[in-house]
Amino acid sequence: MAGDDLVFAVNGEKFEVLSVNPSTTLLEFLRSNTCFKSVKLSCGEGGCGACIVILSKYDPVLDQVEEYSINSCLTLLCSLNGCSITTSDGLGNTEKGFHPIHKRFAGFHASQCGFCTPGMCISLYSALSKAHNSQSSPDYLTALAAEKSIAGNLCRCTGYRPIADACKSFASDVDIEDLGFNSFWRKGESREEMLKKLPPYNPEKDLITFPDFLKEKIKCQHNVLDQTRYHWSTPGSVAELQEILATTNPGKDRGLIKLVVGNTGTGYYKEEKQYGRYIDISHIPEMSMIKKDDREIEIGAVVTISKVIDALMEENTSAYVFKKIGVHMEKVANHFIRNSGSIGGNLVMAQSKSFPSDITTLLLAADASVHMINAGRHEKLRMGEYLVSPPILDTKTVLLKVHIPRWIASSTTGLLFETYRAALRPIGSALPYINAAFLAVVSHDASSSGIIVDKCRLAFGSYGGYHSIRAREVEDFLTGKILSHSVLYEAVRLLKGIIVPSIDTSYSEYKKSLAVGFLFDFLYPLIESGSWDSEGKHIDGHIDPTICLPLLSSAQQVFESKEYHPVGEAIIKFGAEMQASGEAVYVDDIPSLPHCLHGAFIYSTKPLAWIKSVGFSGNVTPIGVLAVITFKDIPEVGQNIGYITMFGTGLLFADEVTISAGQIIALVVADTQKHADMAAHLAVVEYDSRNIGTPVLSVEDAVKRSSLFEVPPEYQPEPVGDISKGMAEADRKIRSVELRLGSQYFFYMETQTALALPDEDNCLVVYSSTQAPEFTQTVIATCLGIPEHNVRVITRRVGGGFGGKAIKSMPVATACALAAKKMQRPVRIYVNRKTDMIMAGGRHPLKITYSVGFRSDGKLTALDLNLFIDAGSDVDVSLVMPQNIMNSLRKYDWGALSFDIKVCKTNLPSRTSLRAPGEVQGSYIAESIIENVASSLKMDVDVVRRINLHTYESLRKFYKQAAGEPDEYTLPLLWDKLEVSADFRRRAESVKEFNRCNIWRKRGISRVPIIHLVIHRPTPGKVSILNDGSVAVEVAGIEVGQGLWTKVQQMVAYGLGMIKCEGSDDLLERIRLLQTDTLSMSQSSYTAGSTTSENCCEAVRLCCGILVERLRPTMNQILENARSVTWDMLIQQANAQSVDLSARTFYKPESSSAEYLNYGVGASEVEVDLVTGRTEIIRSDIIYDCGKSLNPAVDLGQIEGAFVQGIGFFMYEEYTTNENGLVNEEGTWDYKIPTIDTIPKQFNVQILNSGHHKNRVLSSKASGEPPLLVAASVHCATRSAIREARKQYLSWNCIDDDHRERCDLGFELPVPATMPVVKQLCGLESIEKYLEWKTYP
């Protein structure tokens, strides 16, 4: 083995790579060159955690191994020479046995679609390893550390609660009885019994072994790669680095050299150019050391942020400035980015590219300095000087060290240091709206007993300026002054003139307000108390939200039924352990055949324009590109079709005209996915907007220009009652109120993906991550002009769908098939996250105007609505929206209900179905109206809601046959039960008391009901008993994480168990679900609408009934000559008698049970921080009528996951477009779904086991979509808290109580209620008003 070869290990296996492109990432190598596919590509920018691995490094001097988690999507392969990598399937797998982490994730039902689970497991393992190796408390993993271990990991399915429980089960300080519902023990068992049933974990036996062959290599060699073959240099000293840099021709080679440490910067600044040489500077001792003395801490520039934090936190209590900096730095990015990213890299990005850095702000406040070298000349600059110096754009200037001085107070003065940041996620993985760090030396004024500011440093950053700054005018003003309300008021006014975001900065006024709030929080407690505390005091005794306590214990109440054993039992999800280990196969995990090609989409950036040409800059074809496929490449016998629905079809490629930004124009086909993506990025599309008209970019424009889709009569909802009579009966009316609801992105962890294989006789096999294989088959066949039997579409499992893998997956699979047919080679497409977000469309935005009539007691009499639905450029499934919206809005007895609904055709991205499409909007509209009515009447909104809940008679009036029988209407029961179980009345009073006692924090509590109509669809199923008695099952539904396979497996075991022979009660482990294959399972329709699991279960139950009847004669014959019969004996004899052991049915629901209503109630308590607008969900309680659950564990997961996805819609997720209709949000940096630190702190879910559904599938009900609607309780509680803040704000304007109540009317809380939105409604100038009120009462 040559010493200059790239050698490393993966899961103990040796890999020797003789030549590789230095830009190759570890993720690319693992997925393309190894069998280890547990590392998943989801975001490609270090923001989701799906690609996490453990990196182990050996130090031959200390004979120690260091291990930590890293992003494989950003880590360059060449930087891993001599390292060992461990993936989730390296921790454990099917062959060697699963790791305790895998087993506990499965047992706590913490994996649904499974795409994120391997990364979650690695993050937890990393935390366990760190705890084991800790010097202070080995083997002691706290519950807080367990939860924080997954703070950088995203999950769209579970809602995080079961994941948190799985993680906390390893914590030493957790009360095991507080852990959530699981399959290890049942309620009532002793603590000792519970502990025995947990899969045991022994850290001593669980250590990753660093391979001996790597140890020997490291001991014997310098471990430097051949620079010629790898274009990779690894200097061992600063002098050697200077020598390498000096050989570079500044003119010819400028920009071709890249300095590398962790390569994490490419997650934010995407790499768009080819580098000729990479220099790994992470091995230079002078840049890798941390030195401490009495004056300062000196930190090498390549030291990772994690190691900087450790060094700062190790300091004694007297150096609390260091500790404060360390605590704040734990909020930077996520733990795996901090493990790789260096402090120097962060500072250089901030200085040269205006990266919104927290670290520069911290160091600026602490008066840090940097040590740099340029062409042999050393230079030391203070942080302020460094930031304003000319940007470091060349590779000749290198940052060597950072110096942070020690700050120690004298005996007569106090030293104060505090840091701040406002971000959508409290503990990281989100850039701040603004950050700040303040240092002050203070002393007592003997004459006034006040506090004098002797010295201060006030630093602000990330607000939209070029870099972090000091507010010197404010510092000068405060220095020497005795703090008072008037002094602070003037300081705040000065500060607002300093914090001036650039013109194109979003939320500029909000950011100014935050700066004011931070300064107020720093200084105001000193005024109030007249004393200081080195640990820092906060207004209202406020605890820094980033110093998080672990989630409170949550409660899940479920009922496991034995009536239909094993149906109704909470068995572990089928394949959950394989999902955790990463062995579960998704489309992109299928190995590529030789000569496989890859595709990437070129999309439009214009909403309406002629397409003149598609090419590349300078007419130079990028490396690796073999073809660019457009509509012109569709066979003459085919059609330019990309999708099909019951309402029509849509284009695969834009032909001569693009009708929306984000529309597919072409497909680049290249030899690798990286080359395809890079080529698509470099593509140049020439447009011509002449003689084509003005694009329609709003619903108002659409209505004005009559650009509307016509809704078929059968999809038009019917009005209820006489609206004129209803309005006449009203004592009060609210007229012409306008609401708007934005869009939402699916954020499935697995983006759109497909693999197409040309087959013999003009056939194709297409693997597609789709919810609609049969529709996909039809579209491909139509596009290519071949019979459908020539197209075989296969789907095994989908890494999250939520509706986005239904219609929107079809053009991806179709383009892939077209390319495969044209090139006569396998082609695969894995759409990158940015392109996926731009093309996805997402949830339908709405504009609503309404007028409502009601009596003085709160009873509604009439509602008149005008709805404008933005469908985008294509019809898709938008014509179901009117019916869906009205179905959920009818949950209240409106008296009379009329509406005018327009489905608008715009030149915006085509919208599609997203979990609870239309229903979540309709339910929210109802709540907004109820809130407005209650506010108008000065009534408790909870009372108004209860008054207007349906009686059974009004329910029948609004829902007709779907209402079912009277005993099926459980909503009033749920409403009353939740009041007791959630302690709603007492907590409502506690909220009032809290609001009376706190100025800068307000709480709200709200309870909302939901009604959600679902429809059963005809569904096929097939059950085959094989020779050995094992069972193969095929169903039309797709496993997208909803537990469909598990429920079907249970149903087959129940159905075949009716034969009642020995072994028939234990069939569950002998049943296997097969992947969906359109040539095997026809008429499969699509997976959507929450009832697919029920439909498939009923289809296989009917199959089992047929098989049982076929087997009974054989069983009776055996029993004539034997006392008993075993399952194996029965099947063996049936085979001998040529009994048909395969049954296929087509379940067609009866009209009496084809549609039914789902009921639920949710209550949430929310706290709002008036300084920042941050919301915290204190507690959420849900009671949901699931009928007789087919699997309570699965349904519980669906309820929690849907609720948290709803929180995202109502509170966090902004999915907007620019002036051309192109999506603004492009990835994890700017689109924020909920994370572990944003879910309810206490999360209680109860499944009502109602037995009133005998005509349903074993009395079960749907759980996938309805609970999402309950998340409106969070939004309504936030509205309540804001209302209290607004009342207080008005009091500071010296408005009397009566007038204040009148002024409180008319505010609407937009969706999503993000921090800037909440803060604006609470008052952007609330602090100024408060100080003015205190100064000039």
From Swiss-Prot:
Keywords: 2Fe-2S, Abscisic acid biosynthesis, Auxin biosynthesis, Cytoplasm, FAD, Flavoprotein, Iron, Iron-sulfur, Metal-binding, Molybdenum, NAD, Oxidoreductase. [2Fe-2S] cluster 2 binds at residues 113, 116, 155, 157. Its main location: cytoplasm. One of its GO terms (cellular component) is cytosol. Induction: Induced by dehydration, in rosette leaves but not in roots. Induced by hydrogen peroxide H(2)O(2) and aldehyde treatment. Residues 4-91 form the 2Fe-2S ferredoxin-type domain. The active site is at 1265 (proton acceptor). The gene is AAO4. Inhibited by Cu(2+). The keyword Cytoplasm applies. GO terms for molecular function: 2 iron, 2 sulfur cluster binding; aldehyde oxidase activity; aryl-aldehyde oxidase activity; benzaldehyde dehydrogenase (NAD+) activity; FAD binding; indole-3-acetaldehyde oxidase activity; iron ion binding. Residues 225-409 form the FAD-binding PCMH-type domain. It catalyses: indole-3-acetaldehyde + O2 + H2O = (indol-3-yl)acetate + H2O2 + H(+); an aldehyde + O2 + H2O = a carboxylate + H2O2 + H(+); benzaldehyde + O2 + H2O = benzoate + H2O2 + H(+); hexanal + O2 + H2O = hexanoate + H2O2 + H(+). The lineage of its organism: Eukaryota, Viridiplantae, Streptophyta, Embryophyta, Tracheophyta. Gene3D superfamilies: 3.10.20.30, 3.30.465.10, [2Fe-2S]-binding domain, Aldehyde oxidase/xanthine dehydrogenase, a/b hammerhead, Aldehyde oxidase/xanthine dehydrogenase, molybdopterin binding domain, CO dehydrogenase flavoprotein, C-terminal domain, Uridine Diphospho-n-acetylenolpyruvylglucosamine Reductase, domain 2. Its cofactor is [2Fe-2S] cluster; FAD; Mo-molybdopterin. This is Aldehyde oxidase 4.
